[in-house]
């Protein structure tokens, strides 16, 4: 068997074992494709064994707000209680996803980093003034939605969150826990 094929089969075995143990890994930018893959796994686990705990491991630089909220909504719809574990990085929309766990079940590994900020629009925006105004209003609505998530998750005031996300705010796992983004730091699998 060629080495590439053998490695692919090994990866399939690993992926199957992790899914069977109700572990979902989100280790890439938040895109429609990555969100769809996560949602399919969530649905699979919910349909095969509803109500059983799921561990959602996040290492993501963030990405699409709409794709991220699609995952968020599905997590909130399922009956299975979800634990989040940030390892590496949860930035931007990745940090928002780290907050969708059941209360008391938002964790990070000791060297994880979390970054929160306001939403942005990439690239060049062109169009009529009215269209640009529509886009501006939409991004402000998105910003308000994200602020609502951070306020609810952290218990911080709206003013504190607005100030915190005005620019990129980077935090260690300890700092994120003090800020209210995490419930604990994991040092062992036994802590799950």
UniProtKB/Swiss-Prot annotation:
Q: What is its EC number?
A: 3.4.21.92
Q: Which GO terms describe its cellular component?
A: cytoplasm; endopeptidase Clp complex
Q: Which reaction does it catalyse?
A: Hydrolysis of proteins to small peptides in the presence of ATP and magnesium. alpha-casein is the usual test substrate. In the absence of ATP, only oligopeptides shorter than five residues are hydrolyzed (such as succinyl-Leu-Tyr-|-NHMec, and Leu-Tyr-Leu-|-Tyr-Trp, in which cleavage of the -Tyr-|-Leu- and -Tyr-|-Trp bonds also occurs)
Q: Which residues of this protein are catalytic?
A: 92 (nucleophile), 117
Subcellular location as annotated: Cytoplasm
Q: Name one GO molecular function term.
A: ATPase binding
Q: According to the lineage, what is the superkingdom? A: Bacteria
Primary localization: cytoplasm
Q: A Pfam family for this UniProt protein? A: CLP_protease
Which keywords fit this entry according to its UniProt record?
Answer: Cytoplasm, Hydrolase, Protease, Serine protease
GO terms classed as biological process: protein quality control for misfolded or incompletely synthesized proteins
Q: Which Gene3D superfamilies match?
A: 2-enoyl-CoA Hydratase, Chain A, domain 1
- Presence of the UniProt keyword Zinc-finger in the record: no
Please indicate if the UniProt record lists Hydrolase as a keyword: yes
- Tell me the subunit arrangement: Fourteen ClpP subunits assemble into 2 heptameric rings which stack back to back to give a disk-like structure with a central cavity, resembling the structure of eukaryotic proteasomes.
What HAMAP family does the record tag this protein with? ClpP
Query: Which family is it part of?
Result: Belongs to the peptidase S14 family.
- Family annotation (NCBIfam families): PRK12553.1
- Function recorded in the entry: Cleaves peptides in various proteins in a process that requires ATP hydrolysis. Has a chymotrypsin-like activity. Plays a major role in the degradation of misfolded proteins.
Under what name is this protein listed?
A: ATP-dependent Clp protease proteolytic subunit 1
Question: What is the taxonomic lineage of the source species?
Answer: Bacteria, Pseudomonadati, Chlamydiota, Chlamydiia, Chlamydiales
């Amino acid at each position: 068997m060629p080495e590439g094929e053998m490695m692919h089969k090994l990866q399939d075995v690993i992926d199957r074992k992790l899914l069977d143990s109700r572990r979902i890994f989100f280790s890439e930018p938040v895109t429609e494709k990555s969100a769809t893959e996560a949602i399919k796994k969530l649905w699979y686990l919910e349909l095969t064994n509803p109500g059983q705990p799921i561990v959602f491991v996040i290492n993501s630089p963030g990405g699409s707000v709409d794709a991220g909220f699609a995952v968020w909504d599905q997590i909130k719809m399922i009956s299975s209680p979800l634990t989040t574990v940030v390892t590496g990085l949860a930035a931007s929309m990745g940090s928002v996803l780290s907050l969708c766990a059941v209360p008391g079940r938002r964790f990070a590994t000791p060297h994880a980093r979390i970054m929160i900020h306001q939403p942005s629009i990439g690239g060049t925006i062109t169009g009529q003034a009215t269209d640009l105004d529509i886009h501006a209003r939409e991004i402000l609505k998105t910003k308000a939605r994200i602020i609502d998530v951070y306020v609810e998750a952290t218990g911080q005031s709206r003013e504190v969150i607005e100030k915190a996300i005005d620019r990129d705010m980077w935090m260690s796992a300890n700092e994120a826990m003090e800020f209210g983004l995490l419930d604990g730091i994991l040092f062992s699998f036994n802590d799950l």
